[in-house]
Amino acid sequence: MSVGYDRLKTSSLAELRAAIRSGAYRSHTAGLGQGYLQANLAILPEAYALDFMRYCQRNPKPCPLIGVSDTGNPMMFTLGRDIDIRTDVPAYNVYRDGRLDSVSADITEDWRDDLVVFALGCSFTFEHAVMRAGVALWHVDNDRTVPMFRSNIETVPAGPFSGKMVVSMRAVPEDRVAEVAEISRAYPLAHGAPVYWGDPAGLGIADIMSPDWGDPAPLGPGEVPMFWACGVTPQVAIEAARLPLCITHKPGHMLITDVAEDAEVPVVETAQDKR
C-alpha cells in the first residue's frame, strides 16, 4: 500500500524509513525528515573509489562528503543505526558504461562485493530552516521536485571524473535573499551558501522553466532565483567517466540519515559501537 507525501511530512524518521524501505513511498524527499541530514548517493566499484574521493575533496561545494562505506558493505552505520543503502532510498539510477540503464526502488539484485558507497550532503537539509524563517518554497508547497540545471561552472577533475557543476534553484523574495543565503551558509554539510543568484544567464541557463532535472518552478513577482551547488554534479561526472557500473539516487530522491541537520560531524553516536 502506498503512503502519501502529506502524511510523511509529519511522520517520525522510523516511519519514513519504513515506508521507503517497503516501497510504499517512491517519490521525492523535499520537506521530509525534518531535523535530519539528507544525502545524495554515488555507489561505484572500489577500483574507482580513490579517484572519486579526490573528486569530492576538490569540489566540496557540490560534493560535501558525509560518509563512505566499507567495501561491499551496504550498511551505512556511520549515518544511521539500521540504514541499508540497497533499500532505503525512494528511487535509484543504475548506470552502465556511462548510460542510464534503469531506475529502481531496490538495488539488492545489483549489489556487488566490490562496491563502495559515497554519501554527499543535500540542500533539502537546510530547507527546513528556511521555511521555519517564514520563507515559502514552491516545490515543497506543491509536492514537486526542486529544479536542477547544468551550469557553466567547471568542476576540478580527478582521474576519470570531470564535468560542469549542477545547481538547484529556489525562488526567494528579493527582500529575503540575503537572509536565506546566511541561513544556508550555516549548513556546510548541505552545500552551504548559494553559488549565485540573479539572472540565470550568468550560469549559462537559458530558461529556468526548462530544468535538466526536477520540475519547473515559477518565478513570482518580486522573486529572485537563487542557485546552490547540487549533489547531482557527481552524476554528470560519472556519466563522463563511463564506469562499467555506477548507482546513484534518482535526483530529488534522497537518503534520509539519522544525523542531525545541524551536526558539525556527520557520524551518529551509535557508530562508536561498530569500531
From Swiss-Prot:
Its EC number is 4.2.1.-. Pfam families: D-Glu_cyclase. The keyword Lyase applies. GO terms for biological process: glutamate metabolic process. GO terms for molecular function: D-glutamate cyclase activity. Keywords: Lyase. The keyword ATP-binding does not apply. It comes from the Bacteria. SUPFAM superfamilies: PSTPO5379-like (SSF160920). Belongs to the D-glutamate cyclase family. PANTHER family: D-GLUTAMATE CYCLASE, MITOCHONDRIAL. NCBIfam families: PRK05463.1. This is Putative hydro-lyase SPO1111.
